[in-house]
Amino acid sequence: VLVAGSLSLVTIIGNILVMVSIKVNRHLQTVNNYFLFSLACADLIIGVFSMNLYTLYTVIGYWPLGPVVCDLWLALDYVVSNASVMNLLIISFDRYFCVTKPLTYPVKRTTKMAGMMIAAAWVLSFILWAPAILFWQFIVGVRTVEDGECYIQFFSNAAVTFGTAIAAFYLPVIIMTVLYWHISRASKSRIKKDKKEPVANQDPVSPSLVQGRIVKPNNNNMPSSDDGLEHNKIQNGKAPRDPVTENCVQGEEKESSNDSTSVSAVASNMRDDEITQDENTVSTSLGHSKDENSKQTCIRIGTKTPKSDSCTPTNTTVEVVGSSGQNGDEKQNIVARKIVKMTKQPAKKKPPPSREKKVTRTILAILLAFIITWAPYNVMVLINTFCAPCIPNTVWTIGYWLCYINSTINPACYALCNATFKKTFKHLLMCHYKNIGATR
């Protein structure tokens, strides 16, 4: 009883820590971790209800709460357990598409999509198990489970038992193993490619999320940007059709983000001109200001690192500032040359970020824990369909408890494989709430 109670308590605390960590730490609020949040919800329910009711059943030696509570407990237990498996499948597929479709999948990979997938996992698990467990006695016309016992009635049918074991465990495990093999292979291939590929052969423009910043010097006579300041973005070497305008005031920077590489340019004290470079077809319209006293030109290109779990690459920051003692024509030429130079400059590729390794490592740990803890019970289920007396009750109990222990192990997997989870857990346990939302 003491061991079972301790396991239940550790499971509850561990999974509450996971859920609270994701809630309070913005660096953990990623699509992948939302799937882990759903998994933690399932594990928490197992720790609160399933473990304690099963302990009661095994310690007393019979089921004391009647057939209705028995069926409700079994339905909850199997729905939640199946939801855990479905969440693991979702996590594996999500990682697989991140690695194999890095350009198209991240666009679709939104919080809304994650919520829909999580909801589908729970609804499907409920449909698969709850009606069959609760209403099987009415389908066959009789309840065959004896008083004082609690088990799923249709498990007495060997064919049904075999089919549910295949669908609930063996098939998902095969799918997840194959997916992880592809994930590992694709990740290694990318690492080798990044090491072998010389910088000169890399694309001149990086397909990352780039943030253009426009800074305008203070001038008391300066009109609003709506009157006389125009900004154009250069995207992938070509000017877009519509100009992008932003308000620039003292001490303020306006930011604009786009999924393609972009350069925002501002030039003051210049006449409208278009400068074209044939090699990369880079063109920009340099803005016009009514104020003749302003003599500073500033171009800044910055990359913005999105909050994600390594489905999107990141780059560096480049800043170019023009001098203030030149006439308009000279400024125009300087601005145009620097824009062209920056758009032609090869992007330096970095090795896959540590966050990507964290995610892959976490998934591997979760899958291994799931397979190791769930395999004994599901092997016994298959044996039981052919030879019921072959498995003693004690072995059944151990196998069943191993499935529950998986819910205890999962939070430890997150902490061991992800330093951010580990640090956030530590802050929560030690009541260090200051700056916990920014813990990395």
From Swiss-Prot:
The chain crosses the membrane at residues 1-19, 34-54, 72-93, 114-136, 159-183, 362-384, 393-416. GO terms for biological process: adenylate cyclase-inhibiting G protein-coupled acetylcholine receptor signaling pathway; chemical synaptic transmission; G protein-coupled acetylcholine receptor signaling pathway; G protein-coupled receptor signaling pathway, coupled to cyclic nucleotide second messenger; regulation of heart contraction; regulation of smooth muscle contraction. The modification Phosphothreonine is found at residues 420, 424, 439. It is a multi-pass membrane protein. Residues 228-244 have a biased composition (Basic and acidic residues). Signal peptide: none annotated. It is found in: Cell membrane; Postsynaptic cell membrane. Keywords: Cell membrane, Disulfide bond, G-protein coupled receptor, Membrane, Phosphoprotein, Postsynaptic cell membrane, Receptor, Synapse, Transducer, Transmembrane, Transmembrane helix. Residues 192-329 are annotated as: Disordered. InterPro entries: GPCR_Rhodpsn (IPR000276), GPCR_Rhodpsn_7TM (IPR017452), Musac_Ach_M2_rcpt (IPR001065), Musac_Ach_rcpt (IPR000995). Residues 20-33, 94-113, 184-361, 417-440 are cytoplasmic. GO terms for cellular component: dendrite; plasma membrane; postsynaptic membrane; synapse. The modification Phosphoserine is found at residue 206. Disulfide bonds join 70-150, 387-390. One of its GO terms (molecular function) is G protein-coupled acetylcholine receptor activity. It comes from the Eukaryota. Residues 55-71, 137-158, 385-392 are extracellular. A motif (Important for signaling) lies at residues 94-96, 410-414. The keyword Transmembrane helix applies. Residues 258-267, 278-287, 308-327 have a biased composition (Polar residues). Phosphorylated in response to agonist treatment. The muscarinic acetylcholine receptor mediates various cellular responses, including inhibition of adenylate cyclase, breakdown of phosphoinositides and modulation of potassium channels through the action of G proteins. Primary transducing effect is adenylate cyclase inhibition. Signaling promotes phospholipase C activity, leading to the release of inositol trisphosphate (IP3); this then triggers calcium ion release into the cytosol. Belongs to the G-protein coupled receptor 1 family. Muscarinic acetylcholine receptor subfamily. CHRM2 sub-subfamily. Interacts with ARRB1 and ARRB2. Interacts with RACK1; the interaction regulates CHRM2 internalization. This is Muscarinic acetylcholine receptor M2. It comes from Pan troglodytes (Chimpanzee).
